[in-house]
A protein has these predicted regions:
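Metal-coordinating catalytic core of metallo-dependent amide/deamination hydrolases
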Residues: 129-253, 258
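A conserved active-site cap/scaffold subdomain adjacent to cofactor or substrate pockets
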Residues: 257-258, 264-295, 300-301
Length: 432
């Protein structure tokens, strides 16, 4: 299949990280961008799409998600992290069955496609159901089976989650022509015992996998880890070998200068989750410090239970303005840096060097926004327009690997009514 997008604005990123806008044409052949220019190409395309007043940009990458948790949207609102998790979330999660994960994953995918997300990183339970949902929908995802252990007497052999994680990797890693990748995942320091973490981290390294963890989300987490082990969660994971694999660390709100040095030394990717951190009262991640240290900083929504949506445009908005407010400096973070977090930095975190920007030879993971809106005119700074003015409802097209998955309110690969029917049935059973 080949498509030529005509008369559109194209958001381009130079090698120097500077964004520019070009009015012209973008050609897609198969799963790849094969033309960008101001003149109409001479090659033949099977489909031509007039995109006047539309902006084409890279698809957004949500690097920290628990997609089936859309079924828990709003549960435990108003509680801090520990009480929210242990008193409200865990009891519901104990009742989850695979059918719930299937329903929740597809509902989350509807939300993500309509809001311009083309790829996401997910850690949760019954992950084969999420794999199936992503395969059907046509999205990209890095999916992991979250490993936990609350019993210090449990042996590595007794932990059933570890072999489930390994089986998932062996069965699905690089499935669907690489759209689906399998990561390894440890929930957090406070939900997993050291001997399990060490053994599982060694497995991840042996398989050449990527690791996805929660890390230093709150000061309480850090204080309790120091009381238990005499070191911060960052130092604890380093000692146990977790950071020896390419690691994506969500939150990193309460990190010291020493922690940041460890993260940098191991090339850890940090995922900024501003909405979730605000909603749970967790605090503010030291975004500028992390970036100045040379750490790759990506963006995520967290699960819908602590956000309460999967809207990456809202996430970009907060990531742009929040640090400027609490640091009393409007230059603390630039809109271009935030766009990087949501696109090319996310691609780097997921190990997808072939996406994240619009360029010839890159994968055609593209979204289109309708600029013919009062809140999007005039436009003197496209990155700022996207991070501080655009809404997810401005998205009119979402394409992954050259295939249109969502256009003008219509889903091309999922049956919206069926997804809602199954989601309602899951909610009814869970909360009966």
């Amino acid at each position: 299949m080949s498509i030529l997008f005509e008369n559109c604005d194209l958001l381009l990123r130079g090698e120097d990280g500077v964004y520019s806008t070009l009015h012209g044409f973008l050609g897609v052949r198969g799963d790849t961008i094969d033309y960008i220019g101001t003149e109409k190409p001479t090659g033949e395309y099977e489909e031509h799409k007039s995109m006047e007043h539309k902006l084409l940009m890279p698809g957004l990458i949500n690097c920290h998600n628990h997609s089936p948790m859309v079924l828990l949207r709003g549960v435990g609102s108003g509680l801090p992290l520990r009480e929210w998790l242990f008193d409200k979330v865990f009891p519901i999660e104990d009742r989850l069955v695979p059918e719930d994960i299937a329903a929740g994953s597809r509902l989350a995918i509807l939300e993500m496609l309509a809001s311009g997300t083309t790829s996401f990183s997910d850690m949760y339970f019954f992950p084969a159901e999420t794999v199936a949902a992503v395969a059907e929908a046509g999205m990209k995802a890095n999916i992991s089976r979250c490993v936990q252990c609350f019993d210090e007497n449990q042996t590595v052999e007794q932990n059933t989650q570890i072999p489930q994680s390994v089986e998932l990797f062996e069965k699905y890693h690089n499935a669907e022509n690489g759209r689906i990748r399998i990561d390894f995942s440890i929930h957090a320091e406070y939900t997993c015992k050291p001997h399990i973490v060490r053994a599982y981290s060694e497995l991840c390294k042996a398989y050449g996998g990527r690791m996805h963890i929660h890390l230093s989300e709150t000061q309480r987490e850090v204080d309790e880890c120091i009381a238990r082990y005499g070191k911060s969660p960052v130092a604890w994971f380093e000692e146990l070998g977790t950071l020896d694999s390419p690691t994506a660390a969500a939150h990193c709100v309460a990190v010291s200068d020493e922690d940041i040095a460890i993260l940098k030394r191991h090339g850890v990717n940090v995922i900024h989750n501003p909405t979730s951190n605000l909603k749970l009262g967790s605090g503010f991640a030291p975004v500028r410090k992390l970036m100045d240290a040379g750490i790759n900083l990506a963006l995520g929504t967290d699960g819908a239970a602590s956000n309460n949506n999967l809207d990456m445009f809202e996430e970009m908005h907060l990531a742009d303005i929040m640090p400027c407010g609490y640091r009393h400096d409007p230059t603390e973070v630039s809109s271009a840096e935030v766009l990087d977090m949501a696109t090319v930095n996310g691609a780097r975190l997921q190990g997808r060097s072939d996406t994240g920007v619009l360029a010839v030879g890159k994968k055609a993971d593209i979204i289109a926004l309708d600029l013919d809106k009062p809140h999007l005119y005039p436009n003197f700074d496209t990155p700022a327009l996207l991070t501080c003015a655009a809404h997810s409802s401005d998205v009119v097209l979402t394409m992954v690997d050259g295939k249109i998955l969502y256009e003008n309110g219509e889903y091309k690969t999922l049956d919206r009514e069926k997804v809602f029917y199954e989601a309602r049935a899951a909610v009814k059973r869970l909360y009966a």
